[in-house]
């Protein structure tokens, strides 16, 4: 199994010599964290904005817009979380020798119909264990899609059709959306008889999130399903199904990361009358196994960040978010085999967040220009031209990239970091452009703003950090595809830029950052904030659809690569659903983190 490869005695020899398997007692709950306060009782921190005078090396007096970011809630607490090696190995053995082969037999049974297999695949996805059977699933769906017309010709069950639609599209088969026309009346509206089919409506709601541009029926399906499900979510009942409806309406499956979907679905499935005991136990074992896997990785990232100590060396506040950043990477690559990719992704994102905070909320324009020039040289000697505090940042970025490169070379993987270096250089171009607007109080047109604001979202950079340690396709082919600036990443970056600008609008305006998407749209079109946000939400939805379309139809890369941008979009809702949860994490996010990393599922 992959864990043996990821956590064997020869694994990660260069990453700070941190052993991944610690011979300690089994305890996944950090008592120190909650001795003085509970997750639900911690008081929120007020964030004060202020400006201070500063002089550059050229005697240029300027004002620095300083933002106080709340300190990390978690700090280095995960270093004290204990993992029992024997428990970890026992979980791995039971999964590998008992449940994997048993469920494979269920999936490949010659006695199952195509529809039964597709429903089983959907259940495996929901429970977070489909990744064990990627090849089998792709083979099953390839054959089934070839006879789609026959499969759906007489099918009038809404739940079955919606499940087929979701599963096929999730694996790159663009099942036509007109399949849902059969559920409409002559007046062109969805039949009222569907209102009583709660499971069908719920599945329709989930499937509608995989709609592509111009598929109006999927927008109609989303509105129809939500309208009729919302009254059920508000019902005071102990119904397991209604509680599940409430959870889904708060955060739909494709607005949540896969491991969180699995965590919540396992709890729901545990209370279902028709549960399959084999699948239920397998999913529980797998979640607990993954949780221990993740905590081991979090220890590495936390120790590295603590030893780097960059926050204490800088004269301003930065977002110290080692746990939250790791969570973001986990949302992109949750399968255990991507352990190294998650660690690299977390390290690079953390250090580049420092660069972002510096350019965004501290550095003068000449300093941003100097940092831009230094990164384009990509040479430690370039530090000589930087202010002292920027030398710390530049050296930290440079050495982090070099350390990862040495790690990959030690594994026989050469030239993996050039893509990352090129992306860092490109990102600095966008940061410089935004800094020029911000320091001049310039409000560009919305179109001009998005031309720079979209690539500055840097979610293609984020993805590239994970690609370093992935072997799902030829690296040369991956680089060529990435350098071609795929449409899927443009849509993803636009999606994030709009979402981010909406939730951070007041915060950015309060510190004088007038180049914000909402503000640019308001000024250009002479509309209120509410009207601007409404229009931007439409653009956000359209960008999401374009991303889904590209995921389903692109043949340039294998699914294991194309699904990563989609997964990044799923991460967004965790941090930017209602506010800036990355800059200022709230109680919901803290509790979510605890559920994923600190609370195993009872067996």
From Swiss-Prot:
<feature type="binding site">
    <location>
        <position position="356"/>
    </location>
    <ligand>
        <name>Mg(2+) 1</name>
    </ligand>
</feature>
<keyword id="KW-0464">Manganese</keyword>
<dbReference type="GO" id="GO:0016102">
    <property type="term" value="P:diterpenoid biosynthetic process"/>
</dbReference>
<feature type="binding site">
    <location>
        <position position="508"/>
    </location>
    <ligand>
        <name>Mg(2+) 3</name>
    </ligand>
</feature>
<comment type="pathway">
    <text>Secondary metabolite biosynthesis; terpenoid biosynthesis.</text>
</comment>
<dbReference type="GO" id="GO:0005737">
    <property type="term" value="C:cytoplasm"/>
</dbReference>
<dbReference type="Pfam" id="PF03936">
    <property type="entry name" value="Terpene_synth_C"/>
</dbReference>
<dbReference type="InterPro" id="IPR034741">
    <property type="entry name" value="Terpene_cyclase-like_1_C"/>
</dbReference>
<dbReference type="InterPro" id="IPR008930">
    <property type="entry name" value="Terpenoid_cyclase/PrenylTrfase"/>
</dbReference>
<keyword id="KW-0460">Magnesium</keyword>
<feature type="binding site">
    <location>
        <position position="500"/>
    </location>
    <ligand>
        <name>Mg(2+) 3</name>
    </ligand>
</feature>
<keyword id="KW-0479">Metal-binding</keyword>
<dbReference type="GO" id="GO:0010333">
    <property type="term" value="F:terpene synthase activity"/>
</dbReference>
<feature type="short sequence motif" description="DDXXD motif">
    <location>
        <begin position="356"/>
        <end position="360"/>
    </location>
</feature>
<dbReference type="InterPro" id="IPR001906">
    <property type="entry name" value="Terpene_synth_N"/>
</dbReference>
<dbReference type="InterPro" id="IPR044814">
    <property type="entry name" value="Terpene_cyclase_plant_C1"/>
</dbReference>
<feature type="binding site">
    <location>
        <position position="360"/>
    </location>
    <ligand>
        <name>Mg(2+) 2</name>
    </ligand>
</feature>
<keyword id="KW-0963">Cytoplasm</keyword>
<comment type="similarity">
    <text>Belongs to the terpene synthase family. Tpsa subfamily.</text>
</comment>
<dbReference type="InterPro" id="IPR036965">
    <property type="entry name" value="Terpene_synth_N_sf"/>
</dbReference>
<dbReference type="GO" id="GO:0000287">
    <property type="term" value="F:magnesium ion binding"/>
</dbReference>
<dbReference type="Pfam" id="PF01397">
    <property type="entry name" value="Terpene_synth"/>
</dbReference>
<dbReference type="InterPro" id="IPR005630">
    <property type="entry name" value="Terpene_synthase_metal-bd"/>
</dbReference>
<dbReference type="InterPro" id="IPR008949">
    <property type="entry name" value="Isoprenoid_synthase_dom_sf"/>
</dbReference>
<comment type="function">
    <text>Involved in terpene biosynthesis in roots. Possesses sesquiterpene (C15) synthase activity in vitro. Does not seem to be involved in diterpene (C20) biosynthesis.</text>
</comment>
<dbReference type="GO" id="GO:0016114">
    <property type="term" value="P:terpenoid biosynthetic process"/>
</dbReference>
<feature type="binding site">
    <location>
        <position position="504"/>
    </location>
    <ligand>
        <name>Mg(2+) 3</name>
    </ligand>
</feature>
<dbReference type="InterPro" id="IPR050148">
    <property type="entry name" value="Terpene_synthase-like"/>
</dbReference>
<keyword id="KW-0456">Lyase</keyword>
<feature type="binding site">
    <location>
        <position position="356"/>
    </location>
    <ligand>
        <name>Mg(2+) 2</name>
    </ligand>
</feature>
<feature type="binding site">
    <location>
        <position position="360"/>
    </location>
    <ligand>
        <name>Mg(2+) 1</name>
    </ligand>
</feature>
<protein>
    <recommendedName>
        <fullName>Terpenoid synthase 25</fullName>
        <ecNumber>4.2.3.-</ecNumber>
    </recommendedName>
</protein>
């Amino acid at each position: 199994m992959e864990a043996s490869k990821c956590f064997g005695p020869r694994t990660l020899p260069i990453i700070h010599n941190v052993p991944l398997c610690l011979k300690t007692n089994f305890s996944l709950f950090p008592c120190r964290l909650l001795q003085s306060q509970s997750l639900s009782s911690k008081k929120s921190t007020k964030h004060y904005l202020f400006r201070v005078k500063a002089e550059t090396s050229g005697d240029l007096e300027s004002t620095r817009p300083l933002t106080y970011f709340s300190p990390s809630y978690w700090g280095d607490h995960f270093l004290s979380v204990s993992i029992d090696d024997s428990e970890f190995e026992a979980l791995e053995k039971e999964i590998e020798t008992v449940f994997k082969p048993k469920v494979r037999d269920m999936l490949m049974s010659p006695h199952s119909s195509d529809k039964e297999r597709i429903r089983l695949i959907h259940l495996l996805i929901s429970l977070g264990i489909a990744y064990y059977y990627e090849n089998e699933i792709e083979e099953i769906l390839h054959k089934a899609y070839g006879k789609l017309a026959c499969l759906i010709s007489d099918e009038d069950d809404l739940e079955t059709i919606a499940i087929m639609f979701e599963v096929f599209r999730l694996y790159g088969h663009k099942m036509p959306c007109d399949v849902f026309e059969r559920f409409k009346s002559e007046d062109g509206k969805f039949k009222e008889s569907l209102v009583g089919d709660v499971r069908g409506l719920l599945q329709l709601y989930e499937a509608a999130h995989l709609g592509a541009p111009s598929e109006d029926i999927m927008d109609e399906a989303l509105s129809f399903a939500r309208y009729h499900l919302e009254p059920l979510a508000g019902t005071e009942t102990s119904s397991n199904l209604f509680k599940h409806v409430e959870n889904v309406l708060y955060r739909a499956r494709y607005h949540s990361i896969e491991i969180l979907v699995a965590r919540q679905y396992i709890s729901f499935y545990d209370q279902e009358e028709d549960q399959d005991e084999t699948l239920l136990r397998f999913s529980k074992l797998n979640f607990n196994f993954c949780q221990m896997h993740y905590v081991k990785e979090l220890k590495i990232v936390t120790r590295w960040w603590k030893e780097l100590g960059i926050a204490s060396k800088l004269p301003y506040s930065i977002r110290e978010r080692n746990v939250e950043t790791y969570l973001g990477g986990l949302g992109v690559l949750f399968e255990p085999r991507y352990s190294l990719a998650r660690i690299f992704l977390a390290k690079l994102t953390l250090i580049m967040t420092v660069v972002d905070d510096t350019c965004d909320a501290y550095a003068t324009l000449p300093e941003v220009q100097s940092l831009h020039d230094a990164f384009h040289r990509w040479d430690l000697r370039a530090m000589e031209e930087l202010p002292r505090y920027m030398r710390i940042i530049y050296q930290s970025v440079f050495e982090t990239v070099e350390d990862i490169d040495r790690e990959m070379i030690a594994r026989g993987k050469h030239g993996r970091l050039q893509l990352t270096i090129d992306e860092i250089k490109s990102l600095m171009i966008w940061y410089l452009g935004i800094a020029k607007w911000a320091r001049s109080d310039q409000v560009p047109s919305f179109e001009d703003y998005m031309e720079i604001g979209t690539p500055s979202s840097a979610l293609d950079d984020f993805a590239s950090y994970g690609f370093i340690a992935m072997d799902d396709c030829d690296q040369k082919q991956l680089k060529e595809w990435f350098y071609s600036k795929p449409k899927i990443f443009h849509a993803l970056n636009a999606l994030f830029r709009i979402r981010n600008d909406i939730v951070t609008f007041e915060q950015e305006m309060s510190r004088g950052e007038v180049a914000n998407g909402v503000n640019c749209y308001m000024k250009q079109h002479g509309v209120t904030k509410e009207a601007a946000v409404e229009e931007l939400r439409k653009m956000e939805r359209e960008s999401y659809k374009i991303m889904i379309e590209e995921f389903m139809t692109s043949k340039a890369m294998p699914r294991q690569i194309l699904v990563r941008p989609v997964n990044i979009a799923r991460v967004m809702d965790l941090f930017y659903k209602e506010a800036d949860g990355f800059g200022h994490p709230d109680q919901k996010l803290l509790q979510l983190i605890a559920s994923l990393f600190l609370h195993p599922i009872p067996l």
